[in-house]
Amino acid sequence: MSKQEELLIQWGDRVKACLANLDIKSLGRVGVLLGGRSGEREISLMSGNGVLQALLSKGVDAHGFDPGLRNPTELATEKFDRIFISLHGRFGEDGTIQGLLELLELPYTGSGVLASALAIDKIATKQIWISNGLSTPEYEELTAKSDWNAVVKHLGLPLIVKPAHEGSSLGLTKVKSVEELPAAYQLAAGLDKKVIAETCIVGDELTCPLVGQGNSAEALPVIKIIPPQANYDFHNKYFSDETQYLCPTGLTAEINAAVQDLALAAYQTLGCRTWGRADVMLDKKTGKPYLLEMNTSPGMTSHSLVPMAAKAAGVEYADLVLWLLSQTLLQKEGART
């Protein structure tokens, strides 16, 4: 048994021990935030409803709250004791709802205001990772006045163009020629004021879920993603039965460990907490892993990856949800950000 497998089993055992000693009533009245106003609303509804049903199945006094249909300030009148955030993208994963919950003094799942705001900004995230010596593809911020030929000279082809603040591959284009760059920029700019282009790393697409905070944070098993036609777009992420997910990955123990170490460092340098998921590309020529993005509010749908990794540790979906919520009991007043 590898060291990573041993650590995984230990984490699963700690989760089970935590839940065995958990007083459900101590959680009080729980609000599950779902839906929202971002381009990922549909996925958030799927995640949130799954979370809500899981909590109800465990006897938690849980209630859904959709800030896309209601004014978020109405949270103040709901008398919730804590919040499970199942929102994705802007106005849910970017520090805004976290700031409101801080003002309301409501403990919540996921990262705090600063880490959330940093992680959703792909450019700010890259700057922090690079300053900490973590590998991530070369990039440029694009504008309508960008010199497309200079961009290609810097980043090479193919390259990736995407909105700086969107997730779920929304507005993402794989550009194979300089002539395709203007249209790719316009597509991304239609969703976001900031657009990023980055070198396309060709190789295995991986993701690594993470849990915990600070020095006690841990990396869960790496998952290898094999989408149809090597296209892991919005549809193939959430609705396709053709996308394959390998856990274990079939890669060497050394590569899995390197990816986990990189993902964990990425999580810690951003100051993330509770849980997250780092997306990584493994260069097929060099075997070097490159960080793409950090998700601070990962999906919890039937196709989602964090539940898949947790299951490898013997932690079922409903238990994972309950454990994540239980972590809000550890948050201290004034120390949540």
From Swiss-Prot:
It catalyses: 2 D-alanine + ATP = D-alanyl-D-alanine + ADP + phosphate + H(+). Mg(2+) 1 binds at residues 279, 293. It is found in: Cytoplasm. One of its GO terms (cellular component) is cytosol. Keywords: ATP-binding, Cell shape, Cell wall biogenesis/degradation, Cytoplasm, Ligase, Magnesium, Manganese, Metal-binding, Nucleotide-binding, Peptidoglycan synthesis. Pathway: Cell wall biogenesis; peptidoglycan biosynthesis. Binds 2 magnesium or manganese ions per subunit. InterPro entries: ATP-grasp (IPR011761), ATP_grasp_subdomain_1 (IPR013815), D-Ala_lig_Van_CS (IPR000291), D_ala_D_ala (IPR005905), Dala_Dala_lig_C (IPR011095), Dala_Dala_lig_N (IPR011127), PreATP-grasp_dom_sf (IPR016185). It comes from the Bacteria. ATP binds at residues 152-207. This is D-alanine--D-alanine ligase. The lineage of its organism: Bacteria, Pseudomonadati, Pseudomonadota, Betaproteobacteria, Burkholderiales. The gene is ddl.
